[in-house]
Amino acid sequence: MTTKTMKEKATELLQRCEVVTLASVNKEGYPRPVPMSKILTEGISTIWMSTGADSLKTIDFLSNPKAGLCFQDKGDSVALTGKVEVVTDEKMKQELWQDWFIDHFPGGPTDPGYVL
C-alpha cells in the first residue's frame, strides 16, 4: 500500500475543485478574498484564472503580488500562499480562452480587458 504525500493529496483536491478563493491585499492592507473559477492547474504551484484588467484584484496584484489561495471539497481543504503574475500574453490568452468568457469579454481572446 502506498501513502500519498500531502502535496499529492493537495494536487488531487485542487483538480476536483472548480472554484477557488483567491485573496489579494488591498491598498489599505486588508485581505480581499474572492471566489474564482480555475481554468487550468499545473500541480499546485501554477493555477490559471481569468479576470478583468481593471478589476480590483488585478489592481491589487499589480501593486502587491502576494496572495492567498484556498480550496475545499467534502470537508478537505488546502490553503496556500504565493505570488500572482498578471499575464497579458496574447498567445496564452488565446490558448486558455473558454467560450463562456465572452459574457465578460465581448472582444474575445484579444479583448484588452481580458487578462490571466
Label every model-predicted segment.
Residues 28-30, 83:
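Residue-level signal for well-ordered, solvent-exposed loop/turn and beta-edge residues enriched
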Residues 3-11, 15:
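Onset of an N-terminal alpha helix
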Residues 39-75:
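A short mixed-secondary-structure module that forms the rim of ligand-binding clefts
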Residues 21, 46-48, 79:
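General beta-strand recognition
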Residues 12-27, 67-70:
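A short, Trp-centered hydrophobic/proline-enriched beta-strand micro-motif
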Residues 1-5, 57-58:
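Short, positively charged
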